[in-house]
């Protein structure tokens, strides 16, 4: 499932920048963690918490996990898996995300606030 990074404005056929920004992600397939360079100024402790959260999710559930800011600055958990991945736990995925949201509520709320402050400044 390849996601579109750019959206097309139907009236003028101009290419617009994406309205969503990936904060970080991890993959059980290549066993890697990624954090968006736009967030390199986050404290190391927060980056480490994100890494642990994403990597452990992929180790437990499988597939790919991304934390994505939507156009309003809300942080969403997105999962995906290869079509032939029989080990991916689809039901466990939803339960694990709910658990992570509850356990890391303060961290996630702080990241949303950080995003809104930083990216509102960039748009001015």
List each language-model region with its residue ranges.
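Short, Lys/Arg-enriched N-terminal segments with co-localized hydrophobic residues
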Residues: 1-5
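Alpha-helix capping and helix-coil boundary motifs
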Residues: 6-7, 92
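Negatively charged, low-complexity tracts enriched in Asp/Glu with abundant Ser/Thr
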Residues: 9-60
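Amphipathic protein-protein interaction modules
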Residues: 58-115
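Charged/polar positions within long, soluble alpha-helices
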Residues: 113-116, 120-123
């Amino acid at each position: 499932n390849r996601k579109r990074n750019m959206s097309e404005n139907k009236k003028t056929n101009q290419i617009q920048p994406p309205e969503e920004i990936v904060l970080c992600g991890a993959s059980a397939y290549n066993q890697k963690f990624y954090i968006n360079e736009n967030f390199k100024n986050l404290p190391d402790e927060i980056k480490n918490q994100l890494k642990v959260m994403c990597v452990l999710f992929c180790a437990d559930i499988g597939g790919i996990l991304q934390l994505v800011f939507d156009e309003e600055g809300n942080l969403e958990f997105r999962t995906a898996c290869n079509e032939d991945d029989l080990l991916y736990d689809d039901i466990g995925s939803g339960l694990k995300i709910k658990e992570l949201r509850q356990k890391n509520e303060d961290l996630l709320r702080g990241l949303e606030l950080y995003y809104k402050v930083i990216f509102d400044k960039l748009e001015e």
